[in-house]
Amino acid sequence: FFELDMQFHSSIIDASANTPLIETHTQYNRRLFRARFVSSRMRLRRAQTLSQHQQITDALMARDKERTAAGLRGHVRSAVENIKFAFETDQNSTQINEEDKL
């Protein structure tokens, strides 16, 4: 799932042919690779992510700027929530495992 998610995002960015956007996206991926990987392991949220990807794709294909922008904003908000939740869950499970060792 993680690789397909990364390909989806890269495909859109590359298709833009917008050099500053491509460079920003590359830097973003370098900084947040682990966060995105941890977030992608959350199976419960995959359906939501796929639905958002479909909405964004449909809006792009329709060349509907407003719908595309709204879809992207919603997707970014969800991604931030997913990353926060994934790290909170990951930290809690690590903390629980450490306490079990005592």
Residue ranges of each PLM-predicted region?
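Short alpha-helical linear motifs
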Residues: 26, 46-53, 90-99
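C-terminal effector-binding regulatory domain of bacterial HTH transcription factors
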Residues: 65-102
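Conserved amphipathic alpha-helical segments that form helical-bundle/coiled-coil interaction surfaces
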Residues: 1-38, 49-59, 67-77
